[in-house]
Amino acid sequence: MLDINFIEENQKDVEKRLNHRGNDFSKDLKFVVEKNKRRKEILVEVEKLKATKNQLSKEIGFLIRDQKNGEIEQIKNKIVQMDVQIVELDEELKIVVKEMNDVLAGIPNLPDESVVVGADENDNVEVRKSSHPNLSTQAEPHWEIATKLQLVDFELGPKLSGSRFLVYTGLGSKLVRVIADILLTRHTNHGYKEFFLPVIVNAEAMYGTGQLPKFEEDAYKTGDQYLIPTAEVPLTNIHANEIIDGNKLPLNYTSFTQCFRQEAGSAGRDTKGMIRLHQFNKVELVKFAKPEESMNELEKLVIDAEAILKLFDLPYRVIQLCTGDMGFSSLKTYDLEVWFPSQNKYREISSCSNCGDFQARNMMARYKDENNKTQYVHTLNGSGLAIDRLIAAIMENYWDGEKLNLPPVLQPYFNNQKFIK
């Protein structure tokens, strides 16, 4: 969440920058500032009462010495009344802080000043692109290719689990396993530490990365725990309530997990194929960095995700999201989009974000700087990559109408076979 003191000191500027996201947060900002003012007032009142109590307690000592019992009782009654007032103020403080934090939790991160102001995806800016995409009018959709080659069973998934589920079969299953290994090997060879994580987390972890309370309707819940929508959640929460040695920063983590999303609000979109699933496979990248280094680490993160698309020689582009298209916790985001010939357009395959200290404040993830001062760490995350979408893109870009030609990087895993037919 945002720093309430920063909001209080820069309310107009914060309001302006948040409005660039396309929503009016003025009422929320006014509410949290008022609650914070009352919070401070309560703390002052409590401190005054405690100071008066201490002074009266000292006076009782003198009165006992002078045997002034009548005055002693009067002072004791005053102290009892003050204790009641302190309890009442403490209870009010809890309510005020909860009300303030509940609203703060619904306010998104401030877009960085370098982010282009825009309303939606139409205002995003292309940063660079790779080779020219395949513009063939004969391109086949990946779900037809997958069915022909018996790599994916699109009927068995719904039979077992419902819509937006699928089953990889035979060489399709091997593709998932092999690609996950290739991705993890590349990232671990470039300084990322690998984790094999639980896919069920507690509410605190979801709150820490900003999935709660904003996106609860999109999460799968089991009891009081949640299935992860992305490995960003457990990876980033590794350092919740910790103080990291600043000399160890940046920290680079990676993990391959299955992810689970309700896809609330996606009715009618991408109902066929492997683009939008309730259960999907993804390799995630997470970084912890010093504030002054986080933007540079974001550029490195994009390069690390981009390297996978180069490895598979797929047409892609990098775009910078405008203010109106960025995620809730992000202050700056780049998307990597891969070319889908059958749709004649680029589709997102990775989103790389710098969240600044937004998540760290929720999680109390901090570090000691060179002056031994405790500061909030900056967190970054990105897909490296979404495996189901990567497989779909490989199918569409390497299909020649009769067989699926395998990218050179895959061939050693398939007995140097050059294609699947």
Where do the language-model regions lie?
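N-terminal alpha-helical targeting/anchoring segments
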Residues: M1-P133, T147, L151, E155
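TRNA-recognition modules of translation machinery and tRNA-sensing kinases, especially anticodon-binding
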Residues: S26, K129-K421
